[in-house]
Amino acid sequence: MLNDILSKLPPQAANPALLIGHETGDDAAVFKINDEQAVVATTDFFMPIVDDPYDYGRIAATNALSDVYAVGGTPILALAIAAMPMNQMSPDTIQKILSGGAQVCANAGVPVAGGHTIDAVEPIYGLAVVGLVHPDRIKRNCEAQEGDDLILGKALGVGILGAAMNKDELDPEGYRQMVETATKLNAVGAELSKLPGVHALTDVTGFGLIGHLLEICHGSNLAGAVNWNDLPILPAARDYAERG
């Protein structure tokens, strides 16, 4: 739907400095400043996916920072985006959400320099993030090459555990594994971008492994093959998957 909406917007003037726009569904926009630096810009936010407000803030912030890492960049600055039902949520709960996000940013060495808050019917939290990347190290999701191997920076299974949580079937250990993985920074992306054999990057989030792999394959005009037995899967997620 979003692609259809974007396609009907007024045409924008071509700018050779815009290295990544919205055309290929990459994780962030990239704008070239000079031969040594390009600015990475992204924003990401969502409604709560866990009940604990601190964990919610941590997960949302990690997800937003991930978009910069996913194009090979290093985040340098964040702005908080918060829409909260002020007449329904206590100041303490809101503070925990913001603190969770701020802690993740502190762990990443990224200052939260400000932001914007509004009153809303449903809580929404996330970040607008600015990063830097060398123009020669930008990695897109549409430049994979035939013969490339698929490398995952995290174990899979957060979606399965989230589904179990929504059914009130997730045990404490499963919750721990889910949150620990969802709050692990994808900083490895910035390091992988420096390797000559790495041609494409993305972060595996809402669309799952298959959804994001299809995005890479379609954008690169390739097909991909995945061996289920080779995939790193969280132990708790494997257990819940086997239960059906």
Model-derived features: positions:
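Helix-biased detector of long, well-ordered alpha-helical tracts
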Residues: 1-244
